[in-house]
Amino acid sequence: MRKANQTSGRKTAKAKNRAALSAQQTIPYVAMHPDGVCKLPGGLYTKTVEYEDINYSVASTEDQTAIFGGWSSFLNYFDSSLPFQLSFVNRRSHSRSRYKVNIPQADDDFNSVREEFTGMLKNQIARSNNGIERSKYITFGIPAGGIVEARPRLERVEADVMGNFKRLGVPCEPMDGRARLALLHSQMHPGNREPFRFSWKDIPQTGLGTKDYIAPDSFDFRHSRLFRVGQYWGAVSYLQILASELSDKLLAEILELDAEMTVTLHIQTVDQLKAIKTIKGKISDIGKMKVEEQRKAVRAGYDPDILPPDLITFSKDAAELLADLQSRNERMFLLTFT
């Protein structure tokens, strides 16, 4: 019996490490449903909501503070059992702008003024995005035993997410399965001018799967940092952020680059008790480092109250973070920025 279990374990390990044999197998989801629920390996089910921008940069300082506070409350909605991802996609637009200018003609003497104003607005739109179409998405997921269990839970989370966006004054729309497939298709076919052609009724008629409609000709991941999708090359970068605070302009300045790219923030909320315990442990470690530095100072014959600036900064930041977690109901997040 023990031998059989060992053999089964080896087979499972081999299955996990087995390389994909096709472009379709490389795409890491199990099933996409018409209502937008996507099943991932490991029993994780996700949904995606597309949302639009908010006029944060041009708002007054008071309004910016209110927007920032509302966004912080929005992020605090997600607990440790609800991982989520923010995706920002910049792609070159080959079709008409998503923003349309429609000033109808009237039976008066001002049609020439209307035409001039319409032309000016269209030029402003064209110059503002440099042909780059910028889209924003939030994807959230829950573990579940099956689609029947996952669907109502995801619908409740989706309603809460959209309600939070509404309170922020941000237009948003849930994405169904076709919309999510179209987004994946655009990501895997950069520069493609052909529209995404797909219908759910084609699945039983053709015997194809959803991945067959979105997969490129090939994937090539043989290089350490570069990759190839079809005929296009891409690269993946990550940010190692050492600053204790970040400017609220960081993400905006990255997304304003005149380039096709995808920026993702993979966010996992840390359990509140675990976060507090972690910070207390860090504070204890910093305290030990202070004692060690003071001992060194005494042995060297100089003032033990003079500590390295970095140590003072770390101590202050850790104390402030602990106060935020304990008294202000803030949350700690694990963030991967790619």
Each language-model region and where it sits:
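Extended, folded cores of ATP/NTP-driven motor/assembly subunits in large transport
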Residues: 1-338
